[in-house]
Amino acid sequence: MSELTDLLLQGPRSAPELRQRLAISQATFSRLVAREDRVIRFGKARATRYALLRPYRGIERIPVWRVDDTGKAHKFADIRLCWPQGSCLVTGADGDEQWFDGLPWYLTDLRPQGFLGRAWGRKLAAQLNLTDDIRLWQEEDVLYALTVFNGEYTGGWLVGEGNYQRWITAQHPAEIPLDQKLTHYEQLASDALAGEIVGSSAGGEQPKFTYYAQTPSGNKHVLVKFTVPQQTAVSQRWGDLLIAESIAAQILRDGGIHAIESTVLVTSNRQVFLEAERFDCKGNDGRLPIVSLEAVQSEFISSPGSWPQAMRRLCEQQLVTHQSVAQTEVIWAFGRLIANSDMHAGNLSFYLSEPPFALTPVYDMLPMVYAPNSAGMLRDAAIEVKFDLNVSKSAWLTAIPLAQQFWQTVARDPRISEAFRHIAQEMPEKIRQIEEKVARMGG
């Protein structure tokens, strides 16, 4: 190490700052930089900065590609790890350079998370000498793991040369025939519960896998959530919730709101599968880049809030449209009215493009407040709906009839357990109480 590299351990600095700290001339500074092969220069004119590379396990540069909607992989950028720990310099295919204090915000959704992320973490931990608790992985651990993960990331990202080569040489997947779907799904669910990584790296806590299957509208890439066979009240409740999720998506679509296309399949032993078409896939090989509200707000909003609050702040920066803000208010209000207690920033996403970002179809919209808790306890009565003054009157008025229709449909569905149908019969009265509050709001 030298005095120059010691200074750069804390992060990028300009040439004038470095010369002043080292008390040297421009000529001496140029010679020092030329001798340090780990010192890199980026930026232009007065924005020029110097940084210190921080190779990780011998890797200094990580190439990234992105698959387009036709299935072609295009070079997106090179990522170089730098000091301080976790920082990186991203050089785009067009030569544009950007400094990030952590993972680039548009890649943060690739960090392993949820049910599949934990399976991935356990699988790679021993191989890479990492902790099997993915929450403790550092930024460079994540990037390195992404380069060796032999699977597919959501949104068509390819991190590392190996993944690029695998994509180029991959065979087209064979679809699961409709008449064999349940048999295949039962086996895939068993594999997933045993810790196998089946398909892409989708997040979320509900057990799931991804696959390529025949559907009534053609062959599709699908994300499949599932329950264990319904032998207990807990597994039965999870089955109720997956069926309710499909009902919610259908009602939103019928109401003119873009939501996932989904189908429920039930085996003879009451194992429930919710099959949803992946909205980051187009055709057989095409992919569409997506990014969560969580990732977007981490980059552009200093004080995150609810979906409507975050969307308004993004709209002020012209990152989303007023129409998207209004639609999100309706979605949020509908979620409140159907008792969705899990509307965190990872459950609303956008297609990644030049701003304004367009919303993806609504997903993970279900009455999660009725999910079994960690002790296996179940709610058996309707809860009070939380009123939110951050939602406009017009949004409430749009969402209320949709939510009433949702609960009425759940109450009539013979696939739903008697206990949950009873809750569904009670919920319209709770919504009427919200309707009274909305009536007192100004226009």
Curated annotation (Swiss-Prot):
InterPro entries: HipA-like_C, HipA_Ser/Thr_kinase. Pfam families: HipA_C (PF07804). The active site is at D342. The keyword DNA-binding applies. Keywords: DNA-binding, Kinase, Toxin, Transferase. One of its GO terms (cellular component) is cytosol. The keyword Transmembrane helix does not apply. Its EC number is 2.-.-.-. GO terms for molecular function: DNA binding; protein serine/threonine kinase activity; toxin activity. Toxic when overexpressed in E.coli, leading to long filamentous cells. The toxic effect is neutralized by non-cognate antitoxin HipB. Does not seem to inhibit DNA, RNA or protein synthesis, and unlike paralogous toxin HipA its toxic activity is not counteracted by overexpression of GltX. Binds DNA. Might be a protein kinase. PANTHER family: SERINE/THREONINE-PROTEIN KINASE TOXIN HIPA, TOXIN YJJJ. Belongs to the HipA Ser/Thr kinase family. This is Toxin YjjJ. It comes from Escherichia coli (strain K12).
